């Protein structure tokens, strides 16, 4: 029984840490960046799948209130996991890998969930949300809605800041050219990810301007964009 609860807890931690961290970042104004995100997500997906298969193949399965709660939480967090990974990376492979998490989570809840009503309510609600999330993710991946591309990065003379020119492509809605400045002092590097305070947006222009944009640092705290100076806080 302890092994089952422990492994379900490990799976819940694996599936919940990224959505919770990213959503907290949206609220608290910091950015989470995973190094080699596709490789990292593939390894996490493989580990999640192997642990799930082990739990599914156990001959004597422990089913109680704790396993019901833990397995039930896997399903909504798997949907949140899908949305945040695809939203932050916007490629088909992330959508495909995220669906693996959803499938295994649903199977584990079916096996280790104790109450039929709880199972039905959780599965029904999650299915509706999953449909909407997958639809949104397909639009993001295949129709370039909200696709953001960094076209230029320029560090300040002393390396305290770096400016990025961004092509914010909104598809049929047009888009924008953005210039954002990051403070390298407000960054935490961890094992395979980094956490950094959101940048200061110093310029917001028309889509396509980045193609002819001239960017240079006049001093450590003054950035010149197309001949106009912008002071960095």
Task: Describe each model-derived feature in a short phrase.
Residues 1-56:
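Membrane-anchoring hydrophobic segments
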Residues 142-163:
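Alpha-helical transmembrane signal-anchor/signal-peptide segments
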Residues 28-45, 61-113:
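Membrane-embedded alpha-helical segments of integral membrane proteins
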Residues 8-12, 42-45, 68-72, 123-131:
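Hydrophobic H-region at the start of alpha-helical membrane spans
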Residues 158, 165-233:
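Extracytosolic and intramembrane catalytic regions of membrane-associated proteins
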Residues 2, 54-67, 111-122:
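Membrane-interface helix-boundary motifs at transmembrane edges
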Residues 116-145:
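Internal/C-terminal transmembrane anchor helices
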Residues 14-22, 71-83, 130-135:
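Aromatic-anchored segments of alpha-helical transmembrane domains
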């Amino acid at each position: 029984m302890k092994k089952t609860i422990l492994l379900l807890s490990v799976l819940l931690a694996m599936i919940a840490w990224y959505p919770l961290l990213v959503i907290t970042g949206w609220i608290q104004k910091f950015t989470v960046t995973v190094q080699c995100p596709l490789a990292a997500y593939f390894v996490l997906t493989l580990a999640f799948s192997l642990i799930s298969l082990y739990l599914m193949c156990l001959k004597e399965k422990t089913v109680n209130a704790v396993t019901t709660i833990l397995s039930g939480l896997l399903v909504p967090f798997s949907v949140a996991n899908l949305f945040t990974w695809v939203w932050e990376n916007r490629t088909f492979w992330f959508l495909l890998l995220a669906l693996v998490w959803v499938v295994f989570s649903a199977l584990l809840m079916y096996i280790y969930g104790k109450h039929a009503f709880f199972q039905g309510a959780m599965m029904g609600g999650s299915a509706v949300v999953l449909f909407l999330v997958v639809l949104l993710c397909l639009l993001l991946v295949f129709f370039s809605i909200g696709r953001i591309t960094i076209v230029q990065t320029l560090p300040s003379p002393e390396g305290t800041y770096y400016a990025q020119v961004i092509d914010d492509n909104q598809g049929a809605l047009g888009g924008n050219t953005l210039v954002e400045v990051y403070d390298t002092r407000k960054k935490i590097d961890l094992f395979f990810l980094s956490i950094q305070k959101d940048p200061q947006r110093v310029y917001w222009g028309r889509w396509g301007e980045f193609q002819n944009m001239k960017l240079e640092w006049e001093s450590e705290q003054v950035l010149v964009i197309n001949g106009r100076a912008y002071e960095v806080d």
